[in-house]
């Protein structure tokens, strides 16, 4: 899955290794894997409960479907900060629909990051064969 770029953001694909580090609460490992600084409050239990609808074993059994389109939002400036994530709730179904969601850390809200990340993610999804509708 490619990295997506916007004017201010780099959207880095979520991998099983990132999921495992988040679930373990291993901030240093997450930072190393995504090559960016995480907020002090990240990862935390609330993030884990919001972000992962499936358990790690389900993700490992079908990572392509479970992590389809999921990316971490990282600022492209010199600070390289994780400001949130944009995720799809799985790969497209037979009906051609996918559902997108996002989360932005509190200190980075109201700066347009979610709009920017969601736009490029929706464009990416709609460019895939079999995707006809993106719901939010």
Question: Where in the sequence are the language-model features?
Answer:
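GNAT-family acyltransferases
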Residues: 1-99, 104-107, 120-124, 128, ...
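Glycine-rich acyl-CoA binding loop
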Residues: 110-115
């Amino acid at each position: 899955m490619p990295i997506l770029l916007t004017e201010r953001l780099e959207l880095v694909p979520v991998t099983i290794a990132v999921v495992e580090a988040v679930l373990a609460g291993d901030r240093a490992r997450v930072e190393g894997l995504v090559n960016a600084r995480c907020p002090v409050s990240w990862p935390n239990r609330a993030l884990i409960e919001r972000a992962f609808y499936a358990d790690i074993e389900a993700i490992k059994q079908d990572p392509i479907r479970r992590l389809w389109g999921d990316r971490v939002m990282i600022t492209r400036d010199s600070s390289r900060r994780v400001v949130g994530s944009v995720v799809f709730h799985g790969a497209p179904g037979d009906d051609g629909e996918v559902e997108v969601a996002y989360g932005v850390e509190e200190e980075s809200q109201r700066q347009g990051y979610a709009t920017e990340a969601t736009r490029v993610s929706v464009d990416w999804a709609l460019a895939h064969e079999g995707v006809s509708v993106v719901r939010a």
